[in-house]
Amino acid sequence: MILIGMYDSPFVRRVGIALRLYGIAYEHRAWSVFGDAMKIMAYNPLVRVPTLVLDDGEALIDSAAILDALDEMVGPERAMTPRSGATRRAALKTCALAAGIADKAVSLVYERHVHERANPAWIERCAGQITRVMNQLEIARAAQTTRFWHGDTIGHGDVMVSCAVTFMRDALAGDMDLSPWQALKRHTDMCEDLPEFRETYMTFKIG
């Protein structure tokens, strides 16, 4: 397998962490959507990362779809998403909320540092969305008594939350105060201390 994309993307990183947690060997091609667009285009016409190329040449796109495929590959006993019912729905919601704030954080970075003129209304909108979701995730995590979000084994929600919060720490340093969300901080610190997280950490840089 080939994982395309740089680990400073929370979406590429969540896939890299899942592959490591599953013990699936892969080649990592740290291509940038800016500097390596033509290379990525050969596998993904959207020129987006992550892209995961399977051994038979099939290219999977979108991190959620990639994780769904990986869950299927390893089987229901090892899958990092619960099989069914309310627990599954809750886990998928955690993933969706965390992916949403990561997406909004990326939008903020582009608005502040890539666009020639920042749009204050758009910045306010994105920051408000992030704050509301972080508040909801904080309440949910603080209510959990288990080591991980939905039990004693790590799930995709744990990974996505940690990747999103770490990205915001790095990319939005000075722009957002993360101190109100102490349960999320503890969760992220715990996850980031795991080898699979350390091995995929990349300091975020513009350009």
What is each of the regions a protein language model found here?
Residues 178-207:
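Long hydrophobic alpha-helical segments typical of transmembrane helices together
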Residues 98-187:
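GST-like fold's C-terminal all-alpha helical module
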Residues 78-83, 107, 147-151, 177, ...:
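Short, hydrophobic secondary-structure boundary micro-motifs
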